[in-house]
Amino acid sequence: MAPSRKFFVGGNWKMNGRKQSLGELIGTLNAAKVPADTEVVCAPPTAYIDFARQKLDPKIAVAAQNCYKVTNGAFTGEISPGMIKDCGATWVVLGHSERRHVFGESDELIGQKVAHALAEGLGVIACIGEKLDEREAGITEKVVFEQTKVIADNVKDWSKVVLAYEPVWAIGTGKTATPQQAQEVHEKLRGWLKSNVSDAVAQSTRIIYGGSVTGATCKELASQPDVDGFLVGGASLKPEFVDIINAKQ
C-alpha cells in the first residue's frame, strides 16, 4: 500500500441490531485502540444513524448504507444525502451487491446516486464485484471494469471515493477470496484507473476488499500491496471487528 493511502476499514451493519445490542457494540468500539493511520467508518441501519453518531467516539465516522439520487421529493422510503449529513454521518455506501441483486439497482442508478452524493458533500464507498457464475465464466475483469466505468463517469473528485471490491460469491458465504485473488483484482482495478482516469487517481484512491473478512483472514489480506482496507459485514457486529481495524499493526 502506498504511504499516501490511509488504511480504511468500514463496518456494514446491514439490517441488524437494536439500540441495546448496538449500544454494547459501540461501547466496545469506543474503548478500542484505533491506529492513527487507520480510518474507521460504521454504517448502521438508517433508523439508527442518529443514535450511532451520538454514541460513537468522534474517531469513528458514520455512513449510511444507501441513499437516493435527488435532494427531496415524493420518493417513499428513500433518504437523501442532505438527510444523512443532517444526522451527522459523512459517508454513504453505494452499489452494494445486495442493492444490486436483491433490490435490482442498475449500474446507471448507482452512478446517478454516486454523482448526487458527492455533489452534496458525502464521501462514497462505491461497491463493485462479480457473481460466482461470472468468475467461473472468466469475465471477472469485464464485469468489474464495466461497474467501475459507470462510477468513474460520475466522479469529479476522487479524494472522496473509496472503491470496495466485493466478490459476490464471497459475501456472507464464509468463502473468502484468497489474498492472491484479491490482490490480482485490486491491481487490475488500479491499472484501469491509471488508464482511464489518471495515474494520480490510481495511486491515491483506496481500493478495499469485502467478502467474509474475519479476524482470522484480515492480516494476510491487509499485507497485499493493493489492498487498502476492508468493508466488513457480519464480523463488524462482533468484537473481532477491533482485530480487523488493527490488521495493519
Curated annotation (Swiss-Prot):
Pfam families: TIM. It is found in: Cytoplasm. The modification Phosphoserine is found at residues 21, 80, 106, 159, 198, 212, 223. GO terms for biological process: canonical glycolysis; gluconeogenesis; glyceraldehyde-3-phosphate biosynthetic process; glycerol catabolic process; glycolytic process; methylglyoxal biosynthetic process. Keywords: Acetylation, Cytoplasm, Disease variant, Gluconeogenesis, Glycolysis, Hereditary hemolytic anemia, Isomerase, Isopeptide bond, Lyase, Methylation, Nitration, Phosphoprotein, Ubl conjugation. The modification N6-acetyllysine is found at residues 14, 156, 194, 238. Homodimer. Triosephosphate isomerase is an extremely efficient metabolic enzyme that catalyzes the interconversion between dihydroxyacetone phosphate (DHAP) and D-glyceraldehyde-3-phosphate (G3P) in glycolysis and gluconeogenesis. It is also responsible for the non-negligible production of methylglyoxal a reactive cytotoxic side-product that modifies and can alter proteins, DNA and lipids. This is Triosephosphate isomerase. It comes from Homo sapiens. The lineage of its organism: Eukaryota, Metazoa, Chordata, Craniata, Vertebrata. The gene is TPI1.
